[in-house]
A protein has these predicted regions:
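Extended substrate/RNA-proximal surfaces in nucleic-acid metabolism proteins
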Residues: 54-142
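An N-terminally biased module of ancient metal coordination in phosphate/nucleic-acid-related enzymes
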Residues: 1-78
Length: 142
């Protein structure tokens, strides 16, 4: 569908642009309908909606939810990302996403702890400082 992008990320999760910058860049490319689908957070939605007003752009609420799927026959766990669009009752979802933020922060701490023997110091606080005072948004930018 021309002019529609239903899977985007801002710097609220693992993108590089702020929601406002993302909307502006999308508008420059001729996008008129955009879904902000940050990983495990909808914190950028209001910012995107506000920015979209000056571009006559429609914003669709969205989120990319990280989950695990277990295959019983192999006893292996697989990471699965599910993109949810245009949700209505958001309260239960917000509770789930808050848990995901805590899991991400713990994962970042575990990674930093594994690095201590290699580099000789705990860099967790430095990592948090580098993510612009957003410790609940420690992600792998792509």
């Amino acid at each position: 569908m021309e002019g529609v992008d239903l899977h985007t990320h801002s710097n609220i999760s693992d993108g590089t642009f702020t929601p406002k910058q993302l909307v502006a860049a999308a508008a420059e490319k001729g996008i008129h309908t955009l879904a902000l689908t940050d990983h495990d957070t909808m914190d950028g939605l209001a910012l995107a909606e506000s920015a979209a007003k000056s571009h006559a752009m429609r914003i669709i609420s969205g989120v990319e939810i990280s989950s695990q799927w277990s295959r019983p026959s192999t006893q292996k766990n697989y990471g699965v990302h599910v993109v949810a669009l245009n949700m209505q009752d958001l309260e239960p979802l917000h509770k789930c996403l808050e848990q995901q933020k805590q899991i991400r922060a713990r994962r970042a701490k575990q990674i930093c702890d594994l690095l201590i023997p290699l580099i000789g110091e705990d860099i967790y606080l430095d990592v948090l400082a580098k993510v612009e005072q957003m410790p609940d948004r420690v992600t792998r930018t792509h």
